């Protein structure tokens, strides 16, 4: 779910914190991708003409595999170095939210069964998306494919967006790609949404900057976290009657939830045993690994392994799979492809024509020369 209403609130109070762009603008960037969000989108969106998820000849869902394969190829062709982060065990404080989702999914399934029985195809298509969910088996299948493609996969201790944020904070990745805005609350400097949208939707990618949010709002990180808790997060309930604008104004005036509660009108109902402090602690100190010395590795493409898995085991079209592999090979064969291949190298300033002709080698600037440049 993320943070309720945060994107709309930022559009009002911190408009400069969000900018729109295209996927090619991230060429050369290492992006931490919330795998569960991406796979869920493929299960929901990649469907046949009847609205049902794509399956193999044995009736097993394959939408997540085919979607991940082609989307990853597109990212790599755009010069992006993807890192897929998978969910670990959710925190206990999220149990209430997960139970609500389970109940909603069961209701949606009952409505879907009824729509199918009555032959209401349009309603059935809508409900199929609401009942979509990723299983552990599907997650493992995606991991296997990515490993064959040579793409790094990271298993989170807890929730994926927290680990994505940790990778960004450690300088290993530029941004977190997710639809969950709580990646900002967890400390990711940049969060990109609509990152996995298909080209035919023509939706711009939206990038949010945490430092810009704090600068425009005048909030500290702790105050921003308290705002997100008031808006509504996955870890605790909210104060009934306090909407997004009121929440913003309360934090702006009183600086913390503790002070808000001291001055809050009796017309607002505060949840009993409200665990906002525990939620705050989860945002400030999420259960993540230390990535300071962690090395991300993009391995060699296993061409035969991919064919064995996708064509032999999963029964995908061999010609299409081969074309996909060729696209990956073509990208890797282009040595001088800008930031993708020289991402970790230092760019040298070329010599001028006169310097090159005379065989001059540039000297490193002296301390005095450096000081002179600074003054200019």
UniProtKB/Swiss-Prot annotation:
Mg(2+) 2 binds at residues 180, 182, 234. It is found in: Nucleus, Nucleolus; Nucleus, Nucleoplasm; Mitochondrion. GO terms for biological process: base-excision repair; DNA replication, removal of RNA primer. Residues 123-254 are annotated as: I-domain. Residues 336-344 are annotated as: Interaction with PCNA. The keyword DNA repair applies. Residues 1-105 are annotated as: N-domain. GO terms for cellular component: mitochondrion; nucleolus; nucleoplasm. Phosphorylated. Phosphorylation upon DNA damage induces relocalization to the nuclear plasma. Coiled coil: none annotated. Its main location: nucleus. Its EC number is 3.1.-.-. Residues 360-376 have a biased composition (Basic residues). Keywords: DNA damage, DNA repair, DNA replication, Endonuclease, Exonuclease, Hydrolase, Magnesium, Metal-binding, Mitochondrion, Nuclease, Nucleus, Phosphoprotein. Binds 2 magnesium ions per subunit. They probably participate in the reaction catalyzed by the enzyme. May bind an additional third magnesium ion after substrate binding. InterPro entries: 5-3_exonuclease, 5-3_exonuclease_C_sf, Flap_endonuc, HhH2, PIN-like_dom_sf, XPG-I_dom, XPG/Rad2, XPG_CS. Belongs to the XPG/RAD2 endonuclease family. FEN1 subfamily. Structure-specific nuclease with 5'-flap endonuclease and 5'-3' exonuclease activities involved in DNA replication and repair. During DNA replication, cleaves the 5'-overhanging flap structure that is generated by displacement synthesis when DNA polymerase encounters the 5'-end of a downstream Okazaki fragment. It enters the flap from the 5'-end and then tracks to cleave the flap base, leaving a nick for ligation. Also involved in the long patch base excision repair (LP-BER) pathway, by cleaving within the apurinic/apyrimidinic (AP) site-terminated flap. This is Flap endonuclease 1.
């Amino acid at each position: 779910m993320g943070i309720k209403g945060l994107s709309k609130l930022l559009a009002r109070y911190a408009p400069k914190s969000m900018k729109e762009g295209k996927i090619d603008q991230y060429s050369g960037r290492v992006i931490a991708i919330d795998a569960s969000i991406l796979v869920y989108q493929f299960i929901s969106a990649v469907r046949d003409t009847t609205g049902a998820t794509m399956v193999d000849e044995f009736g097993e869902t394959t939408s997540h595999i085919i979607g991940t394969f082609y989307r990853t190829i597109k990212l790599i062709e755009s010069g992006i170095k993807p890192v897929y982060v998978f969910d670990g065990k959710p925190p206990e404080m999220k149990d209430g939210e997960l139970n609500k989702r389970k109940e909603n999914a069961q209701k949606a399934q009952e409505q879907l069964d009824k729509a199918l029985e009555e032959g209401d195809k349009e309603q059935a298509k809508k409900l199929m998306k609401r009942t979509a969910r990723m299983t552990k088996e599907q997650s493992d299948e995606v991991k296997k494919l990515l490993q064959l493609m040579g793409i790094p996969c990271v298993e989170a201790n807890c929730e994926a967006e927290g680990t994505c944020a940790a990778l960004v904070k450690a300088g290993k990745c530029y941004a977190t790609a997710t639809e969950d805005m709580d990646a900002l609350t967890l400390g990711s400097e940049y969060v990109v949404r609509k990152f996995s949208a298909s080209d035919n939707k023509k939706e711009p990618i939206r990038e949010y900057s945490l430092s810009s949010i704090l600068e425009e709002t005048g909030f500290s990180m702790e105050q921003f976290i308290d705002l997100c808790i008031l808006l509504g997060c996955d870890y605790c309930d909210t104060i009934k009657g306090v909407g997004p604008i009121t929440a913003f104004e309360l934090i702006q005036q009183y600086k913390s939830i503790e002070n808000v509660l001291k001055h809050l009108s009796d017309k607002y109902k505060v949840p009993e045993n409200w665990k906002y402090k525990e939620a705050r602690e989860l945002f400030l100190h999420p259960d993540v690994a230390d990535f300071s010395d962690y090395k991300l590795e993009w391995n060699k493409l296993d061409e035969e392994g991919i064919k064995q898995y996708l064509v032999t085991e999963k029964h995908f079209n061999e010609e299409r799979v081969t074309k996909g592999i060729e696209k990956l090979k073509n990208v890797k064969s282009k040595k001088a492809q800008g930031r993708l291949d020289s991402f970790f190298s230092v760019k040298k300033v070329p010599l001028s024509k006169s310097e090159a002709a005379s065989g001059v080698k540039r000297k490193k600037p002296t301390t005095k020369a450096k000081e002179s440049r600074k003054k200019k």
